[in-house]
From Swiss-Prot:
Family from the record: Belongs to the bacterial ribosomal protein bL9 family.
Organism whose genome encodes this protein: Verminephrobacter eiseniae (strain EF01-2)
Entry-linked Pfam families: Ribosomal_L9_C (PF03948), Ribosomal_L9_N (PF01281)
Gene Ontology CC: one annotated term: ribonucleoprotein complex
Signal peptide start and end residues: none
Alphabetized PANTHER family for the sequence: 50S RIBOSOMAL PROTEIN L9
Protein name per Swiss-Prot or TrEMBL: Large ribosomal subunit protein bL9
SUPFAM superfamilies hit by this protein: L9 N-domain-like, Ribosomal protein L9 C-domain
GO process terms (BP): translation
Keywords: Ribonucleoprotein, Ribosomal protein, RNA-binding, rRNA-binding
C-alpha cells in the first residue's frame, strides 16, 4: 500500500514522503495513529495544501523536545530498593519506576519514552538510561540504585 507520511517515522521516512508499506502496518498502526494517509490523488493534493502547516507543527514539536532535552540532560535519579548483601535487588527497577521519579522532579514523561538497554536494572549501582523525547532527540540520564537492607 502506498502512503503519505504525515510525521517522521523511524526506519521508514520523513514528513511528506510517499512510501510503500505492508497493508497491515498501514491499516493497523500508521493510519490510526495519524502518522500516515493513503496516497490517493485527492490525499496528495490535500497534503500539498497543508504541507507548510504540518512542517511548522513538526518543527515546533522538535523545538519543544530539544528544550526539554536540555533541561533533562545530565539529570541524576536516586532510587532505593531492597537488596541482598551481594548487591542484587529483590525485584528490579523498571522504566515505570524511572518515569515515576522523573515525573516527581517535574518532567512529564510516559514510561514508553524510557529505554533500558539491558532490560530492568537488577543490581545496585549507577546505570545510564536513554530517554527518547522525539525521534531526533535522545537524552542520557544516570540512574543510581541504592540497596536498603531490612
Amino acid at each position: 500500500m502506498q502512503i503519505i507520511l504525515l510525521d517522521k517515522v523511524v526506519n521508514l521516512g520523513n514528513l511528506g514522503q510517499i512510501v510503500k508499506v505492508k497493508d497491515g502496518y498501514a491499516r493497523n498502526f500508521l493510519i490510526p495513529t495519524g502518522r500516515a494517509r493513503r496516497a490517493t490523488e485527492a490525499a496528495k493534493a490535500e497534503f500539498e495544501a497543508k504541507r507548510a502547516e504540518l512542517e511548522k507543527t513538526a518543527a515546533t514539536n522538535l523545538a519543544q523536545a530539544q528544550a526539554q532535552g536540555e533541561k533533562l540532560a545530565g539529570t541524576a535519579i536516586k532510587l532505593t530498593q531492597k537488596a541482598g548483601v551481594d548487591g542484587r535487588l529483590f525485584g528490579s527497577v523498571t522504566n515505570h519506576d524511572i518515569a515515576e521519579e522523573l515525573n516527581k522532579q517535574g518532567f512529564k514523561l510516559a514510561k514508553s519514552r524510557i529505554r533500558l538497554p539491558n532490560g530492568p536494572i537488577k543490581m545496585v549501582g549507577d546505570n545510564t538510561v536513554s530517554v527518547v523525547l522525539h525521534t531526533d532527540v535522545v537524552v542520557e540520564v544516570i540512574v543510581s540504585v541504592y540497596g536498603e537492607t531490612a
